[in-house]
């Protein structure tokens, strides 16, 4: 009787472990996605300056930085039928660390060096040894700079806001 209870409890435990693994994989994927967004919105000089503060491991370019075109698709009103809006230039690169992690970098424009640095950061974020260092010395300061810039632009836009209800109503 005790054996059957243990077996019955083992099956849900396996399901929980699989679910936990899936959540962990999804959170790592979400973290990489967020890191890529921060790097894509940062200037190449800022990324380069932050990377200089880290002792970078040996790495090789799997794919030399290259430039190409992508088709930008649009939708009218955000939910209409998709149409081809136009083409945009992009740069991409791939880097492999000596420990085996592979990183990919894409950025709008023709800045191949920025794409290579993004790929290097992507590989470093996947590494257990360098993930925390890259987060604290590269990603967090860049994220803070982007947030400050957005807040400053929002404040500038808010300062020029006109409340038409107050204008039309008038006094008297």
For each predicted feature, which ranges?
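Acidic, Ala/Val/Gly-enriched low-complexity intrinsically disordered segments
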Residues: 8, 13-16, 20
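N-terminal, charge-rich interaction modules
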Residues: 20-55
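A hydrophobic, small-residue-rich beta->alpha segment in the mid-to-C-terminal subdomain
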Residues: 99-140
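Cysteine/selenocysteine-centered motifs that mediate thiol-based redox chemistry or coordinate metal-sulfur cofactors
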Residues: 32, 40-41, 125-172
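Intrinsically disordered, low-complexity segments enriched in serine/proline and basic residues
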Residues: 1-4, 10
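Short capping/connector residues at structural and topological boundaries
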Residues: 77, 88-90, 112, 147, ...
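Structured beta-strand/loop patches that form or line metal/cofactor-binding pockets in enzymes
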Residues: 53-98, 104-105
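A short, structural micro-pattern
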Residues: 87-89, 118, 156-158
């Amino acid at each position: 009787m005790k054996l059957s209870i243990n077996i019955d409890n083992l099956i849900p435990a396996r399901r929980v472990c699989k679910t936990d693994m899936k959540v962990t994989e999804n959170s790592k994927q979400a973290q990489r996605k967020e890191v890529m967004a921060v790097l894509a919105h940062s200037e190449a000089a800022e990324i380069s300056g932050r990377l200089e503060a880290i002792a970078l491991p040996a790495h090789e370019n799997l794919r030399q930085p290259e430039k190409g075109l992508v088709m930008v698709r649009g939708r009218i009103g955000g939910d209409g039928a998709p149409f081809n809006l136009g083409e945009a230039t992009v740069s991409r690169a791939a880097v492999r660390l000596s420990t085996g992690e592979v990183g990919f970098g894409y950025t709008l424009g023709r800045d191949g060096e920025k794409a290579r640095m993004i790929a290097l950061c992507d590989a470093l974020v996947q590494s257990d040894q360098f993930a925390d260092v890259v987060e604290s010395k590269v990603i967090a300061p860049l994220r803070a700079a982007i947030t400050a810039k957005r807040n400053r632009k929002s404040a500038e836009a808010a300062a020029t806001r006109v409340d038409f209800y107050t204008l039309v109503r008038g006094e008297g």
